[in-house]
């Protein structure tokens, strides 16, 4: 009963806070909504019949999912240049040019170093191998519902970022989640993972600082977390073709 009462109070506070926030910004929200009806994000008066990529209101499905994060591109959370990095000419990569044949400099100026699924990118979504290790460790040593909420939010953001590479899930959100069809560049939702992964990593670090003995008590989880991240990084270094069949060395 005590737990239920606390949950009810916390829920009520969240609802009241949300209502206050909405009421304070109601004018901006209303005018933005009103303006949106007259833009490409509003409902079109010209709707083609039997066209699968249209939404009932909002942007076109192909337009929304144009910048979809590749499934194998998700490894950039741990390894930043897993898909080549930013969409810039290979000639701008000084480290690569030191090993390249100078006779082909003009060709390198035409080749982009990014080879992922997106039309282009200014850089990968990167968290870091060490932070990922702490995140995995946090799944074992951190207690409480917050851990599972952060894990669920991380997985959800990754699945949504895949966009056209995971269309059944994307279609569900486009068809049934309000306002989702108003936004483009689904890969940008990985900003959630960029927040939740370090947050759980910090919670794990705090747990270790507060209870240093947990490192010896849960040593197998420490080894497992380190082994997973270090093992994958090592495989990337020596056998990238395992993860990317179309990889060209």
PLM segments and residue spans:
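Membrane-interface helix-loop-helix junctions at transmembrane boundaries of multi-pass membrane enzymes
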Residues: 2-12, 96-108, 134-164, 213-225
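Hydrophobic alpha-helical membrane-interfacial segments at the cytosolic entry of transmembrane helices
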Residues: 6-33, 48-53, 156, 220-238
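Membrane-helix boundary/interfacial segments in multi-pass membrane proteins
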Residues: 113-125, 156-196, 209, 243-249
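Transmembrane alpha-helical segments
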Residues: 132-139, 197-209
């Amino acid at each position: 009963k005590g737990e239920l009462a606390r949950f009810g109070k916390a829920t009520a506070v969240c609802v009241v806070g949300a209502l206050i926030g909405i009421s304070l910004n109601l004018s901006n929200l209303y005018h933005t909504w009103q303006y949106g009806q007259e833009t490409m994000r509003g409902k079109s008066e010209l709707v083609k019949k039997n066209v699968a990529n249209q939404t009932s209101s909002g942007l076109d499905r192909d337009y929304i999912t144009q910048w979809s994060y590749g499934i194998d591109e998700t490894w950039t959370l741990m390894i930043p240049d897993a898909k080549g990095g930013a969409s810039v000419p290979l000639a701008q990569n000084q480290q690569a040019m030191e090993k390249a044949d100078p006779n082909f400099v003009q060709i390198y100026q035409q080749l982009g170093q990014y080879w992922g699924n997106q039309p282009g990118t200014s850089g990968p979504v990167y968290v870091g191998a060490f932070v990922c290790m702490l995140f995995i460790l946090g799944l074992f040593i951190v207690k409480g519902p917050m851990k599972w909420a952060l894990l669920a939010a991380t997985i959800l953001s990754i699945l949504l970022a895949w966009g056209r590479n995971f269309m059944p899930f994307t279609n569900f959100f486009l068809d049934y989640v309000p306002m989702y069809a108003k936004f483009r560049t689904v890969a940008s939702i990985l900003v959630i993972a960029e927040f939740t992964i370090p947050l759980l990593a910090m919670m794990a670090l705090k747990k270790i600082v507060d209870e240093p003995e947990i490192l010896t008590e849960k040593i197998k989880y420490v080894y497992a977390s380190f082994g997973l991240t270090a093992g994958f990084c090592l495989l990337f270094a020596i056998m990238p073709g395992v993860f990317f069949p179309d990889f060209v060395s």
